[in-house]
């Protein structure tokens, strides 16, 4: 019983940390710039809750301007529908990094390791 209580407290704490307010960068409006280039970075659209591509003309950007999708997703993970967090299967994501993470295996009642690729997934 004591182990179950520890696991429950750990997940409650984890959920609070991971679902806190988004980084303030994520609420900045996209800035298309004021030069003549045609670049296609990503920005976090706080209305849709997703990272999206846009045309940036260069010069005059803010911090909500990411060269790569994974940078945007890492900084601004978006709105998560957590549902029952403890019953989620691990999803390693679509990138190729190698981060050891943990998930709660509802069948065994234990936390187990899995490899997270760095973007996407359900961490």
Curated annotation (Swiss-Prot):
Which UniProt keywords are given for this protein, alphabetically ordered?
A: Disulfide bond, Ion channel impairing toxin, Potassium channel impairing toxin, Protease inhibitor, Repeat, Secreted, Serine protease inhibitor, Signal, Toxin, Voltage-gated potassium channel impairing toxin
Q: List the molecular function annotations (GO) for this entry.
A: potassium channel regulator activity; serine-type endopeptidase inhibitor activity; toxin activity
- Keyword Amino-acid biosynthesis present in the record's keywords: the answer is no
Recorded hits in InterPro entries, A to Z, give:
Kunitz_BPTI, Kunitz_BPTI_sf, Prtase_inh_Kunz-CS, TFPI/VKTCI-like
Per UniProt, residues of the BPTI/Kunitz inhibitor domain are 26-76, 86-123
Lineage: superkingdom: Eukaryota
Q: What does this protein do?
A: Dual-function toxin that inhibits both serine proteases and voltage-gated potassium channels (Kv).
Protein name listed in UniProt: U13-hexatoxin-Hi1a
């Amino acid at each position: 019983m004591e182990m179950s209580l520890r696991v429950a407290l750990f997940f409650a704490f984890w959920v609070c940390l991971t679902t806190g307010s988004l980084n303030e960068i994520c609420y900045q409006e996209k800035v298309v710039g004021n030069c003549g280039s045609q670049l296609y970075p990503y920005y976090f659209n706080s209305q849709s809750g997703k990272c999206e591509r846009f045309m940036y003309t260069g010069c005059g950007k803010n911090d909500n301007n990411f060269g790569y999708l994974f940078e945007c997703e890492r900084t601004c993970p978006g709105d998560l529908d957590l549902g029952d967090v403890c019953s989620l299967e691990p999803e390693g994501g679509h990138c190729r990094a190698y981060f050891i993470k943990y998930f709660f295996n509802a069948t065994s009642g234990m936390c187990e390791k899995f490899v997270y690729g760095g973007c996407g997934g359900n961490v």
